[in-house]
Amino acid sequence: MDKLQRDGKEDTPRQRRFLYPLLFQEDLYAIAYDHYFNRSSSFEPMENSSSNDRFSFLTVKRLISRIRQQNGSIVPFVNCDQTKLVGHNRSFYSELVLGGLTAVPEVPLSIRSEHSLERMNEWTSFRSIHSILPLMEDKIPHSNFILDIRIPHLTHPEILVRTFRRWIQDAPSLHSLRSVLHEHRNLIISSNLDQLILIASKENTRLSLFLWNYYAYECESLLVPLWKRFFYSRSLPYESFIERTPFYRKIEHIVIFYHKYLKKSLWFLKDPSIHYVKHRERSIIALRGTYLLAKKWRYHITKFWQCHFHLWPQPYRIYIDELSNNCFSFLGYLLSVKMKTSVVRIKMPDDSFITDLITKEFDPIAPTTLLIGSLAKEKFCDISGHPISRLAWTGLTDDDILDRFDRIWRNIFHYHSGSSKKDGLYRMKYILRLPCAKTLACKHKSAIRVVRERFGSELFTKSSPKERESIFLSFSKTRSQRERIWHSDIIQINPLINSCRKKHNLQIEPLFDR
């Protein structure tokens, strides 16, 4: 694989056209076996694995030599009954073939990604999810509308094959990929990424995620150059915009300009403010302009999907939201822009006066109601927030019970430390303290009062002294209650917060039809 990448850097077109021979290399299936074994071992112990799932490289060599003699393709791996052919489990060898087909397209795509990163010297990778929020904090207040985009799900495997044609000219590899995609249609047909991973866990998660990421990358890689061209283009096309026409007419009636001088003067009117962020299957485009401009962008993006990917997305896939009147959910936060009024004293040489300065401020809030719903789903409380004891944890030691509740609380606080209002986090801590006390009371068959007298302030103090100091300072009354803290070590969303995010998406999806 490394040698192929080194050769590909010297002659990338030749490397793209001859990927199919990789499918006949035993080392490729050894790599696929490693991925399969690592994934399987995390779900079940070795003693529970079937004897038919034991991998044999000798069997792979026999199958490869048999295909070479028949001068066929990789289709017998997928469509034939492997149990009758070699006496092994068909699904197991199908997993290995899918893993091999995943590794082959990754070679040219990884080389292309390395070249693109080498050309972008200013590129810096931020792995933390919170790295998106400071960008939104800086740019969103200057925008008027957002386009909440959900990437349309694929409806046919041939769409992916056509996108691969742009980068891979090896026809046998494309035919093999087409056969696998038609055989395993549920690897790519799903309404969202969470459903895709849930379905693919029974088949091949690595191939599913690779196909989804490649498809999302294609959607972005074709849109971003259009935005860059729009940003660096001259302002002359703005004259054809409908919302600008009355403005031009007013200028023509007030001052008489020659047509060529009018166009030169309108160069200062150009104000393209387009900001784009993406997480999983959701994308946010922030625009500064009128509602008509936002509708035009939605129309162009929809037409773009139809022309390049032959997709007809539903209307709720692109939702226009006005920031001044509404909030939107993203990354487990409720985000909005609010007006902030400040009293300013203006001093002049002869006099001074006081006036109000109105500014826009980014306002992220932790969705307390949805978080309580997620806690209710996990049986920590009821739907109204009334605490419930965890009877399933009564068999654990006291330290384990305290540590589990403390870890849940620290994860919630750590992720939502950027919330502008900490009252909801206080409530979450109160809700979690009572189930912890009730669980300990049920274990020791005593009252909650006795548990509190026994443990005292040790509830939720299992974290390290440094973490306790950070939490104490964050909740200190001397600090601003609206101070936001973004962490650079959050690389994935907490499962409880992820459940909250999915629940909120289900609640707001019917509103997208308007």
From Swiss-Prot:
GO terms for molecular function: RNA binding. The keyword Signal does not apply. InterPro entries: Domain_X, Maturase_MatK, Maturase_MatK_N. It comes from the Eukaryota. Keywords: Chloroplast, mRNA processing, Plastid, RNA-binding, tRNA processing. It is found in: Plastid, Chloroplast. GO terms for cellular component: chloroplast. The keyword Lipid metabolism does not apply. GO terms for biological process: mRNA processing; RNA splicing; tRNA processing. Pfam families: Intron_maturas2, MatK_N. Usually encoded in the trnK tRNA gene intron. Probably assists in splicing its own and other chloroplast group II introns. HAMAP family: MatK. Belongs to the intron maturase 2 family. MatK subfamily. This is Maturase K. It comes from Dioon spinulosum.
